[in-house]
């Protein structure tokens, strides 16, 4: 028996970097509601009392940027001055230009030119059969802890909870499958009056125990709840936030490789985002079809060129048929050209703000078409299984 451990982390929607991601994707959604094929690359910076937007946007849409920013910040929970960051009073600055025409000429579709990739780059997709949603278990449970913290905070059940929080989960694996929780770290911002003992007890009983599988918790499990002692100063007061700084939280928690490109604030012509979503779709269908227990796909592109420059499959020795056959089936069943994958996943929709917290993958919402396993039956049949 082979025993290993693996750790992944998540952060809450009130974490400064996630505030930035949500604002960037809210801008994208607001534009796509009016102009689905707009070119959007929206970056956000947040710090005490300030939100700054930047990037390149080419669109016919008009969006009240200030109103949108304030709405997002307030909805997250930064809605009064005691938190040091308030959607009603923060400054909103903007420095947004248009997409370079040199980029546009390679990406736009016109006579004798198919839509090309918005940039060069490499993207990965991953799936594993260790959870029902075919995600790595450490990141899956780290996200669920953060969702639970937000649920309790917004419901007022633990009225001392504040928006900023982080989680980290270390799981023990035996022969490639998770069997136990070896460590949990949960840090949550709180109001100053709460007693440390009460906080520890509430986090354990109301957040950790309801989320993590009871059979995985054991006498040796380490619990680190607000290990610095106090966490009153948080959000953009404690740390600056920037779009695209939580790319491992957004994906597979480090269990799979990452091409380096962030997602939030980018329209589907940017393969950093759309091809990573397509990669998840491919990998999940391969695992759902039973062709492998684990699957990682890499795709790469050249700017302005439609066809991927490479497609490769890694199954970590868990394949049930030849990897060469899996690669052949991927090419036959999935159109990974920019235009093809956008159509395949119906990505010209204002669905992106929902992706910007608690993970882009592993949440089977109707809008998240890349989580469907509708290709699994055909893949399995064509593989002869």
Curated annotation (Swiss-Prot):
Region (Flexible loop): 99-109
Record has Ligase as a keyword: no
UniProt-annotated binding residues for L-methionine: 56, 99, 239, 270
GO CC terms, sorted: cytoplasm
Binding note for cofactor: Binds 2 divalent ions per subunit.
Cofactor: Mg(2+); K(+)
Catalytic reaction(s) noted: L-methionine + ATP + H2O = S-adenosyl-L-methionine + phosphate + diphosphate
Gene3D superfamilies on file: 3.30.300.10
Presence of keyword ATP-binding: yes
Highest rank taxon of the organism: Bacteria
SUPFAM superfamilies xref list: S-adenosylmethionine synthetase (SSF55973)
Enzyme class: transferase
Residue sites binding K(+) per the record: 43
Protein family: Belongs to the AdoMet synthase family.
Its biological purpose: Catalyzes the formation of S-adenosylmethionine (AdoMet) from methionine and ATP. The overall synthetic reaction is composed of two sequential steps, AdoMet formation and the subsequent tripolyphosphate hydrolysis which occurs prior to release of AdoMet from the enzyme.
NCBIfam families per the UniProt record, alphabetical: metK
Subunit structure, interactors included: Homotetramer; dimer of dimers.
Name listed for the protein in its UniProt record: S-adenosylmethionine synthase
Organism, scientific name: Hydrogenovibrio crunogenus (strain DSM 25203 / XCL-2) (Thiomicrospira crunogena)
Lineage of producing organism: Bacteria, Pseudomonadati, Pseudomonadota, Gammaproteobacteria, Thiotrichales
């Amino acid at each position: 028996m082979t025993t290993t451990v693996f750790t992944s982390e998540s952060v809450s929607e009130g974490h400064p970097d996630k505030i930035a991601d949500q604002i960037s994707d809210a801008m994208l959604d607001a534009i796509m509601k009016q102009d689905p094929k707009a070119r959007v690359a929206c970056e956000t910076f947040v710090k005490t009392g300030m939100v700054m937007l930047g990037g390149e946007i080419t669109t016919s849409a008009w969006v009240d940027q200030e109103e949108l920013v304030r709405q997002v910040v307030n909805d997250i929970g930064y809605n009064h001055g005691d938190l040091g960051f308030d959607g009603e009073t923060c400054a909103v600055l903007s420095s947004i230009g248009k997409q370079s025409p040199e980029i546009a000429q390679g990406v736009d579709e016109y006579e004798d030119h198919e839509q090309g990739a918005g940039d060069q780059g490499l993207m990965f997709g991953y799936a594993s059969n260790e959870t029902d949603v075919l995600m790595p278990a450490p990141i899956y449970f780290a996200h669920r802890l953060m969702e639970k913290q937000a649920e309790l905070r917004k419901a007022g059940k633990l009225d001392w909870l504040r928006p900023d929080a982080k989680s980290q989960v270390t799981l023990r694996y035996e022969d490639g499958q998770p069997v136990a929780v070896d460590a949990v770290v949960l840090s949550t911002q709180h109001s100053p009056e709460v007693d440390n003992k009460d906080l520890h007890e509430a986090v354990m009983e109301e957040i950790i125990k309801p989320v993590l599988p009871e059979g995985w918790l054991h006498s040796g499990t380490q619990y680190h709840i607000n290990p610095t002692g106090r966490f009153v100063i948080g959000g953009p007061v404690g740390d600056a936030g920037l779009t695209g700084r939580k790319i491992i939280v957004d994906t597979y928690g480090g269990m799979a490789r990452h091409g380096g490109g962030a997602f939030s604030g980018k329209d589907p012509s940017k393969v950093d985002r759309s091809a990573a979503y397509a990669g998840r779709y491919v990998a999940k269908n391969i695992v759902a079809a039973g062709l492998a227990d684990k699957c990682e796909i890499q795709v790469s592109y050249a700017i302005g060129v439609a066809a991927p420059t490479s497609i490769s499959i890694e199954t970590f020795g868990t394949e049930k048929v030849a990897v060469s056959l899996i690669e052949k089936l991927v090419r036959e069943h999935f159109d990974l050209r920019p235009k093809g994958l956008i159509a395949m996943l119906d990505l010209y929709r204002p669905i992106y703000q929902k992706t910007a917290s608690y993970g882009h993958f592993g949440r089977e919402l109707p809008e998240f078409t890349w989580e469907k396993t509708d290709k699994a039956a055909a893949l399995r049949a064509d593989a002869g299984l």
